[in-house]
Design a protein with these regions (language model features):
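Intrinsically disordered, low-complexity regulatory segments
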Residues: 1-167, 356, 389, 393-397, ...
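Alpha/beta-hydrolase-fold enzymes
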Residues: 91-95, 99-158, 299-304, 313-446
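N-terminal cap/lid segment of alpha/beta-hydrolase-fold proteins
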Residues: 174, 179-215
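Short, surface-exposed "cap/lid" segments of acyl-processing enzymes
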Residues: 199-273
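Conserved acidic catalytic loop of the alpha/beta-hydrolase fold
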Residues: 273-277, 287-306
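Short beta-strand/loop motif that positions the catalytic acidic residue
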Residues: 456, 461-464, 468
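Conserved alpha/beta-hydrolase "acid-adjacent" motif
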Residues: 469-475
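Catalytic active-site module of serine/aspartate enzymes centered on a nucleophile-bearing elbow/loop
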Residues: 486-542
């Protein structure tokens, strides 16, 4: 394929036969000899010329890396992206982690196993959790102190503030701070319905469906939004009418913002929240849940396909699910990855994450961070402090942890975003990110010459920031252009001056990023995919 199918207007299905032959080529089972993370294929540097578009490389199949103008470029000189991933260490496997044949493209992470509990084992568990609570309270206090010192440091690096419409920045909306999607939806004139999605493993996931009661007719084509780590579905609704979720509703789509396990107090059909088995999951299990999420939304809407938009961890779990479940790709008309979490950035190799990685084993990790929720003192602080104060404090702490800046944000949005950030999540999940993702330097095995993804992989759009240091997008682009012949790329957006959350929260994201998301969805919808069933829950035809 020397030309993008979308550039010619062809269907992506026309290339199934060619993709299948590529997928089974003789070198599929070979590994790259340079396991130290070097670039034997010579693909690094594809798409680095600053312009509206970058000329395609001979291996890029006619795909252009787009450089849309951002508000940051109005106040600062464009810089080359700092997108070096952490070194890849394939042999840094924990005793509990191994690569097995059932997962040929990514490293399998075996979560902790826990049997039934009697009164003695429950008592022992609670004693250990109390010890963990003491340690994490001390650790959180130290982090908060360091974060405040960083925030008050007059010499720390700051980027120029992006220009925002004066009237928009100064206006008073009358919103209060809330952790409920329903509140913001109703405040801005939308309707929010909450659904419980029960997965095959018994976990109950909360999903919020947003619609506009002022618009006549049906709801439109279904779009699923999946948030990142330590966030909830509220992440897509905190920028007023410029929120991604509301913006997509205004464009005529049926928006579903879904949550991972444990968010909004969601439970399990059998395991209680005190049970470690309730919290025994990592990114791979979150990818398993997405299969049930997609099936649920398709049943409710009556469509055969839907569009998926993920941010950060929401992209990593979908990448894993699409590799593991080949049929899942046939149910997605498109996949938009904002800040894709496939290669870690340098922020995850600094304090305090480097100290956390020094914990030598899962047993030691469970002693320090417990076997249930991660950092329970954070939840206690959330309950004690007023939402306004907690939002500002969380902004300072997470700014220190992830080394981000707020130069692209509207100031009044910050406490709204962070009063719903830092939610309690699985300790096992953080163990995966720090002991598998960061330690090895990739979710998948980059030594594989064969494609990571099958021919059923849906059309893909990727957007990443040039100063995103939490995860890096450019190495993923290089990999896609060099080896992933099964992936049909719609857009690649390299956003100058954007950080990890700016694709959703940036002051000009509604002009720079959102239209590309809509274009991806519209261009990949099957025109024959129309709803055909009555929704039993509401009794309305979609």
């Amino acid at each position: 394929m020397n030309e993008s199918a979308y550039a010619r207007g062809d269907s992506w299905h026309d290339y199934d036969d060619e993709w299948e032959s590529d997928f089974h080529r003789e070198e599929d089972s070979e590994l790259l000899s340079h396991s130290d993370g070097s670039d034997p294929a010579g693909v690094a540097g594809i798409g680095t010329r600053r312009s509206g578009r970058t000329a395609p490389d001979s291996r890029s199949r006619g795909v252009y890396v787009e450089h849309p103008h951002t508000a940051f470029e109005d106040v600062a000189v464009a810089e080359e992206p700092d997108q070096e991933p952490l070194p890849f260490h394939p042999d840094e496997l924990d005793p509990e982690t191994a690569k097995v044949e059932d997962f040929p493209a990514f490293f399998h992470h075996k979560v902790g196993e826990y049997g039934d509990f009697n009164w003695f084992s429950r008592f022992y568990l609670e004693i250990r959790q109390l010890f963990m609570l003491l340690l994490t309270t001390i650790g959180l206090s130290m982090v908060m102190g360091l974060a405040i010192l960083r925030y008050m440091n007059p010499f720390r690096k700051n980027y120029p503030k992006a220009r925002v419409d004066f009237e928009y920045e100064r206006r008073i909306t009358g919103e209060r701070y809330s952790e409920r999607v329903q509140y913001y939806a109703e405040f801005w004139g939308y309707q929010c319905e909450e659904y419980d999605i029960i997965t095959r493993g018994g976990w109950i996931l909360k999903a919020h469906r947003i619609s506009d009661p002022r618009r006549p007719g049906g709801r439109g084509y279904p779009v699923v939004l999946q948030h990142g780590i330590l966030c909830t579905s509220l992440f897509f609704f905190t920028s007023e009418e410029r929120s991604l979720g509301f913006w997509l509703v205004d464009q005529g789509f049926d928006v579903w913002s879904t949550n991972i396990r444990s968010n909004f107090g969601a439970g399990h059909t059998t395991n209680k929240r005190w049970d470690p088995r309730f919290w025994a999951w990592s990114l791979i299990e979150l990818g398993d849940d997405l299969v049930d999420v997609v099936d649920f939304v398709l049943r409710e809407t009556g469509y055969r396909q839907l569009a998926f938009v993920g941010h950060s961890q929401g992209t990593g779990s979908m990448f894993l699910a699409l590799e593991k479940y080949k049929e899942l790709g046939t149910k997605l008309s498109s996949f938009t990855a904002l800040g894709p979490a496939v290669y870690p950035g340098k922020s995850l190799n600094r304090l305090p994450f480097r100290v956390m990685r020094m914990v030598p084993s899962r047993w030691a990790w469970s002693l320090v961070f417990g076997v249930r929720e991660f950092m329970p003192p954070l939840g206690i602080v959330r309950q004690i402090l007023p939402k306004f104060l907690f939002g500002h404090m969380a902004y300072i702490v997470f700014g220190y942890l992830f080394d981000f800046h707020d130069h692209n944000w509207v100031d009044r949005h910050k406490p709204k975003v962070f009063c719903a950030t830092g939610v309690l999540t699985s300790s096992e999940l953080l163990y995966y990110w720090l002991h598998c993702f960061v330690a090895r330097g990739c979710v998948f095995d980059p030594r594989l010459r064969r494609p990571w993804f099958p021919p059923t992989f849906p059309p893909l759009t990727i957007a990443y920031g040039t100063i995103d240091h939490l995860v890096v997008g450019k190495p993923l682009i290089d990999r896609l252009l060099a080896y992933e012949s099964n992936v049909q790329i719609v857009h690649i957006l390299e956003l100058q001056g954007y950080e990890h959350m700016d694709m959703v929260l940036g002051c000009d994201a509604f002009k720079v990023v959102y239209p590309k998301i809509k274009d991806t969805i519209v261009r990949t919808i099957d025109p024959e995919d129309v709803p055909f069933v009555e929704v039993p829950r509401t009794g309305r035809y979609i």
